[in-house]
Amino acid sequence: MTENNRLSVKLPGLDLKNPIIPASGCFGFGEEYAKYYDLNKLGSIMVKATTLHPRFGNPTPRVAETASGMLNAIGLQNPGLEVIMTEKLPWLNENFPELPIIANVAGSEEADYVAVCAKIGDAANVKAIELNISCPNVKHGGQAFGTDPEVAAALVKACKAVSKVPLYVKLSPNVTDIVPIAKAVEAAGADGLTMINTLMGVRFDLKTRQPILANITGGLSGPAIKPVALKLIHQVAQVVDIPIIGMGGVANAQDVLEMYMAGASAVAVGTANFADPFVCPKIIDKLPELMDQYRIESLESLIQEVKEGKK
């Protein structure tokens, strides 16, 4: 078996030569990282969130360092669907035609999500949609879509009805019980899950006596959240039959294999890209050696082994 075959995985809409995917919000649309290496080396790319209209994001400061991670409250800043469809995604496809694109979709109400999902699958090389259901629902008092199984299922069903590509739903860890939400979105037609999104946190400035972030709270990411991600992925993998793209604190090849042990079928790398722009290709290069060390023939065989273990 060649190294390429050992690392390749097939998911709904995604035929990946390797499982490593830069996470949405940590890689922009690839322009900055393309200065460092050929993005065709990646398995896929989860591009920055797309909303129907441009969003300018939250006031600054938007980021704060924490032990083994960071807090961010960017606020889904993006140029909006039209610019992304006419400029950002065509640039990616033209320069990196071998790179499958996963479009991340966000919104403030169901109609916004549906409008974006109906169109973004038309862009060349967009093979799947990642639905960010952690956004506040302005029509339900600001409660995030992803905290209520019925609300989440209704959103997924509406988006699935118009989407031209498979739909992966990004689950929030900021809930009492993630299992009913995972089962609800699967029943509503989700083709896969991505998890986990960031945990909520806050830091204070001792001099000003105020929160460091202008938004007060932010999303906690980085190595600090990996055990939480592994626990929730393992929990959800026991009860769903759709594939999971695991994320949360991944920084090296060992972390990737841990995600597989928990039940993931591919892995997204987020905050680690800020510390080392080359982290994704480094992980890809290291994986075959580590798989040899632990007698793993291929990632597909590991997926099957983990599935057999949960029966």
Curated annotation (Swiss-Prot):
What is one term from the GO cellular component aspect held by the record? Answer: cytoplasm
Which SUPFAM superfamilies does the entry mention?
FMN-linked oxidoreductases (SSF51395)
Q: Is Transcription regulation a UniProt keyword of this protein?
A: no
UniProt keyword annotations, A-Z: Cytoplasm, Flavoprotein, FMN, NAD, Oxidoreductase, Pyrimidine biosynthesis
Q: Report the GO molecular function annotations.
A: dihydroorotate dehydrogenase (NAD+) activity
InterPro entries given in the database record: Aldolase_TIM (IPR013785), DHO_dehydrogenase (IPR050074), DHOD_1B (IPR033888), Dihydroorotate_DH_1 (IPR024920), Dihydroorotate_DH_1_2 (IPR012135), Dihydroorotate_DH_cat (IPR005720), Dihydroorotate_DH_CS (IPR001295), Dihydroorotate_DH_I (IPR049622)
| Biochemical pathway | Pyrimidine metabolism; UMP biosynthesis via de novo pathway; orotate from (S)-dihydroorotate (NAD(+) route): step 1/1
Name one process (GO BP) from the record: 'de novo' pyrimidine nucleobase biosynthetic process
UniProt remark on cofactor binding: Binds 1 FMN per subunit.
Top-tier EC class: oxidoreductase
State the oligomer form and interacting partners. Answer: Heterotetramer of 2 PyrK and 2 PyrD type B subunits.
Specify the protein name. Answer: Dihydroorotate dehydrogenase B (NAD(+)), catalytic subunit
